[in-house]
Amino acid sequence: METINAQIIMNRIEDNDVNWIYHHFSDDFQEVSSFDELTKLLEEYNRIRTTNTQYKHIHINHQDEYIWFDSKMTSGVSVTLNKYQEIISLVLIPLRHIHVSKNTKQTYTLPIVQDWLVWSGGDNVLLNSHYHYKHQRHALDLICVEQGMTYKGNPQLCENYYAYNKPILAPANGIVVEIVDGIADGVPGEINTNHPEGNYIIIKHNRHEYSMIAHIKPNSFKIEKGDELLRGQHIANVGNSGNSSEPHVHFQVMDSNDLQMAQTLKIKLHNYASPVKGDIVTYTGDNILVNKDNYFSAFIKSISTNITQIFRN
């Protein structure tokens, strides 16, 4: 088996080596990919890019993701390999930064305890899958990882995931203004698009800010609508309800409690923490610690089924 590393992959991309890249696609990825589309994509990407620098290497759940940004942060690349070193995802995109971002006025803590991995979070689409959507743009997704895996045993059972049933905490003092419960946890790998948030809670905080935590385990709420909460209070447990491919915590802060109309705010966290995809975050009850040097620097949410092309004039 040919050994592939990050430098080899990037060299082939920068050389427009379509044959080599397509040859290293998995069979499933070739079936949904076009050789001609790949040719055009590489040409367009190399037309706009500057010098690339590797940003992260992901090695988790038997998959590897490599992420690069160019020197001007105007374009980025993500390549994911399976355990056979076949390419199962390829993303080459221009990076569009939203310069007008409102920060929260008050400070929050993360709604978790102990060590969690930031699955999605940051200021571009390669780091944050929510970034295109103003009502989720600054959301964080958090998962648990042990020895390079998010689960043990059968990956189709929620209870085999390390995040499942862990406590969720109130991120700041506030009042519960909405609870949705009764939506069953889904089978990992399958999603519920009819109820994308799954079971969730919205908490009203000071200064007209509202936090929302989603994908909660059904019948695990420890509080009720109208209850006053204290920061760090146990409010529910982690589940896999809604549009969730595996048990995790979705956390965002908004300027309204209307999920369809609200805009997310960039969360000002305790200790000035600013975690992004791949960081390990630890909340001790007093401090938020961020480890940006963790080897398992991101999580592969799912195998991409298409070559992503978002180049526009």
Locations of regions flagged by a protein language model:
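Short histidine-centered loop motifs in beta-beta connectors
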Residues: 209-232
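Short acidic-aromatic low-complexity motifs
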Residues: 3-28
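Zn2+-dependent peptidoglycan hydrolase active-site motif and core
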Residues: 163, 173-217
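A structural signal for short beta-strand/turn segments enriched in small hydrophobics and glycine
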Residues: 174-176, 226-238
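Exposed beta-sheet edge and beta->alpha loop/turn motif
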Residues: 57-106
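Acidic, glycine-rich catalytic/binding loops that coordinate metals and/or anionic ligands
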Residues: 195, 222, 227-230, 252-313
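Short solvent-exposed beta->alpha transition segments
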Residues: 19-59
